[in-house]
Curated annotation (Swiss-Prot):
One Pfam family it belongs to: T2SSF
Phylogenetic lineage: Archaea, Methanobacteriati, Methanobacteriota, Methanomada group, Methanococci
Keyword Membrane in annotation: yes
Family according to the record: To M.jannaschii FlaJ.
Protein name from the UniProt record: Uncharacterized protein MJ1286
GO CC terms of this entry: plasma membrane
Keyword Transmembrane among record annotations: yes
C-alpha cells in the first residue's frame, strides 16, 4: 500500500513538472512572438521598471503589453460583432486596445509610487532602528541584515533585503551598494539619504553620529508631513460639518416653509416635497459620512494606528487556549457584564412583544433597546481593548526610561527587568512582569522581546520591541541602545500628543453641530411647525417629528464613527462618541422635544 502511495505521489509530481514546463514554454514562445512583432525599447521606462521592482525590461515588457492589447481587442471585436453591430465592434476593438495599453504602461508607475510611499512612511522609524543599533558600534551591513528581518518596516525592510543581497550574495562593497540603491530606489528621500551615507563613508565619519543626525532630520520631516496631513483633514472636517450638519438642518427648515408657501399659493414646489427628508437622512448623511471617512482614512498616515480587531474581542468570550489545548473555562467580568446586558435585552424584547409602555417609552423603543443591549457587550469590549492598547502606548516611554536607568546603574538587562516589574505601569505592568519572569527562568532575552513584538497591537510598541529584540541579539552596548530607544519613544509620544491636540477642535465642532441640530429640532417642533402646518392637509407635526428623531440617531452613528476615524484612524475609537451622541440625543428628544 505504501509503495502504491509513493508511486501515486511521484506520478503526481511528474505531471506537475510537465504542466509547469508546458506553461513555461508557452510563456516563452509568447514573449518571443511579441518581441519579434514589436521592437520597442525605452531607457526611461527601463528605469521605472527597475524602481517598481519588476523583473523585466522595456524591450520585453512593452511588446507583451502591445500584443496582449491587440489579442484582447480582437476578442472584444468578435463578441461585439456577434452581439451588436460593426460600429460597436470597431469601438470595442479600439477601446479595448487603448485601455489595455494604458493599464500596462501605467502599472509600473503606480507600483513604483506605492513602493515610494511605503518607504517614506517607514523611513524615520527604520532609521530609529538603525540609529539605535549603530550606537552600539554594530557594523553597517549587520544593521541592515537585522532590519531586513523586520517586516513591520514595510518598504524599508525590502530595501534592506536588497542591500543585504548586494553585499552578501553579489559581494559588492557597501559604498557601491548604497550608490546603486540610490539610483534604483523609487523614493527620492531615501535616495538623498543613501548619498549622504556614501559621502560620510568616503570621508571616514563615525557612522553612529551620521545615522543619528539622519534619524533626527527624518523625524522632523515626518512631523511636518503629519501636520500637513492634519491640515488637509481639517479642511475636510469643515466640509463634513456643512454637508452632514448644516445641509440636513437647511432641508428640515426649508421643507415645511416651502410646503406652507405652496399651500397658500396653490403651486407645487420642489423644496416643499416631504420626500426630501428621507432622501436627506437615509441617503445623503450616510453617503457623505462614508466618503468623508474614506478620504480621512486615506489621508491620515498609519504611524500611530492600533490594530484592534474583532478577533481580539471574541477571544475574551472564548475558552482560554495554550498552544492549541483548551483550558478549563473560567468566569471573567466580561462574561457577567454580557449576561447582565443580555438579560436586559430579553426584558426589552418581551416588553416590545406585549406592547407595554413605561414612562414615555413605547414598543419600538424597547425593540431598539433590545438590539442595543444584545450587541453592547461586544461594542464595549472592543472599545475597552482600544483603551488598554492606547494606555500601554503612553506607559512605554516611562518603562523604557526606568529600564535604561537600571541598566546604566550597572545591572544586566534581566535584573533590570525584574526591578521594573515592581513598578506600576498601568496596563503594561502585566506584560513587564511576564517578561521578567520568563527571563528569570532562563528564556533568551531576544525570544521574550520577539513575543512582545508579535503580540502587541500598536505599531509604536512593535517598533520598540523590534529594536529591543535586535539589541539582545547583536550583543552590542545595551546602555546606548536603550538610551536611543527611550529618546525615540518619548519623541513618538510627544508627536502623538501634538497631533491629538490639533484634532480636538474638530471634535468640539462636530459635537456643537450635533447639539445645534437638537436645538433646532426643539424650536421647530414647539414653535415653527405648528404654525406652518396649520393650513396644510396631509402633513402633521408628528410626521416631521419622526424624521427629526431618526435624523438624530443617524447623525449620531455616522458622526461618531467619523470622529473615530478622524482622531485614531479607527471606527472602534468612535464607539464612545456614537454611544454618547445616541444616549444624549435619544433622551433629549424623548423628554424635551417629545417622542
Amino acid at each position: 500500500m505504501k509503495n502504491l502511495l509513493k508511486r501515486y505521489v511521484s506520478i503526481k509530481n511528474i505531471i506537475k513538472v510537465i504542466e509547469l514546463d508546458f506553461f513555461a514554454n508557452l510563456k516563452l514562445r509568447y514573449y518571443k512572438l511579441a518581441m519579434k512583432l514589436f521592437k520597442i525599447e525605452d531607457e526611461k521606462f527601463d528605469e521605472i521598471l527597475l524602481k517598481a521592482g519588476m523583473n523585466a525590461v522595456s524591450s520585453t515588457y512593452l511588446p507583451v503589453v502591445f500584443l496582449t492589447s491587440i489579442i484582447l481587442g480582437l476578442i472584444i471585436f468578435i463578441i461585439f460583432l456577434i452581439v451588436f453591430n460593426i460600429f460597436y465592434a470597431i469601438f470595442g476593438l479600439i477601446g479595448g486596445i487603448f485601455i489595455v495599453i494604458l493599464i500596462g504602461v501605467l502599472y509600473p508607475y503606480v507600483l513604483a509610487e506605492e513602493k515610494a510611499k511605503s518607504i517614506d512612511e517607514n523611513l524615520p522609524y527604520a532609521f530609529a532602528f538603525i540609529s539605535a543599533l549603530s550606537s552600539a558600534n554594530i557594523p553597517v551591513v549587520e544593521i541592515f541584515t537585522s532590519l531586513s528581518k523586520e517586516d513591520i518596516y514595510g518598504g524599508m525592510s525590502k530595501e534592506a533585503k536588497e542591500i543585504v543581497k548586494d553585499t552578501k550574495v553579489f559581494n559588492y562593497d557597501i559604498i557601491t551598494t548604497f550608490l546603486r540603491r540610490a539610483r534604483i530606489t523609487p523614493s527620492k528621500k531615501l535616495s538623498s539619504v543613501y548619498y549622504n551615507i556614501v559621502a560620510s563613508l568616503i570621508v571616514g565619519a563615525e557612522m553612529k553620529n551620521i545615522f543619528h543626525e539622519i534619524y533626527e532630520r527624518l523625524m522632523e520631516d515626518r512631523k511636518l508631513e503629519l501636520f500637513e496631513a492634519i491640515e488637509k483633514v481639517e479642511i475636510l472636517s469643515e466640509f463634513y460639518v456643512i454637508a452632514c450638519g448644516m445641509i440636513p438642518l437647511f432641508v428640515v427648515m426649508t421643507v415645511p416653509v416651502a410646503s406652507s408657501i405652496s399651500a397658500i399659493l396653490q403651486t407645487a414646489s420642489l423644496f416643499g416635497d416631504p420626500k426630501l427628508l428621507p432622501l436627506t437622512f437615509y441617503l445623503w448623511v450616510p453617503i457623505a459620512s462614508i466618503i468623508f471617512m474614506g478620504l480621512v482614512y486615506g489621508i491620515l498616515p498609519k504611524d500611530f494606528k492600533l490594530n484592534v480587531s474583532l478577533l481580539d474581542v471574541l477571544k475574551e468570550f472564548d475558552e482560554p487556549e495554550i498552544e492549541g489545548i483548551k483550558m478549563k473555562f473560567k468566569w471573567k467580568p466580561v462574561h457577567f457584564i454580557t449576561l447582565f446586558f443580555w438579560m436586559l435585552s430579553i426584558i426589552s424584547f418581551m416588553l416590545f412583544f406585549i406592547r407595554k409602555s413605561i414612562f414615555k417609552f413605547h414598543g419600538t423603543d424597547f425593540l431598539m433597546f433590545g438590539i442595543l443591549f444584545l450587541i453592547l457587550p461586544f461594542i464595549l469590549t472592543s472599545y475597552w481593548h482600544f483603551i488598554i492598547e492606547n494606555q500601554k502606548e503612553r506607559y512605554y516611554p516611562i518603562f523604557l526610561n526606568d529600564l535604561t536607568m537600571a541598566v546604566r546603574s550597572g545591572m544586566d538587562i534581566i535584573r533590570a527587568m525584574q526591578v521594573c516589574a515592581r513598578t506600576n505601569y498601568g496596563p503594561l505592568t502585566k506584560i513587564v512582569k511576564k517578561m521578567a519572569i520568563q527571563m528569570s527562568w532562563g528564556r533568551p532575552v531576544n525570544e521574550v522581546f520577539a513575543d512582545l513584538e508579535r503580540t502587541e497591537k500598536s505599531l509604536i510598541a512593535k517598533r520598540i520591541a523590534s529594536i529591543l529584540k535586535e539589541c539582545a541579539v547583536s550583543g552590542g552596548d545595551v546602555k546606548d541602545i536603550l538610551t536611543s530607544v527611550t529618546v525615540h519613544a518619548y519623541k513618538l509620544s510627544e508627536m502623538k500628543r501634538e497631533i491629538s491636540a490639533r484634532q480636538f477642535i474638530y471634535v468640539v465642532v462636530i459635537y456643537l453641530s450635533f447639539f445645534l441640530y437638537i436645538g433646532t429640532s426643539y424650536i421647530m417642533v414647539h414653535s415653527l411647525l405648528p404654525t406652518l402646518l396649520k393650513n396644510i392637509h396631509g402633513l402633521s407635526v408628528e410626521f416631521y417629528k419622526n424624521y427629526l428623531f431618526q435624523g438624530i440617531l443617524i447623525y449620531s452613528i455616522f458622526s461618531g464613527a467619523s470622529l473615530g476615524i478622524l482622531t485614531e484612524r479607527s471606527i472602534i475609537a468612535g464607539i464612545k462618541h456614537i454611544l454618547l451622541m445616541l444616549i444624549v440625543g435619544y433622551m433629549l428628544f424623548k423628554f424635551y422635544i417629545g417622542g
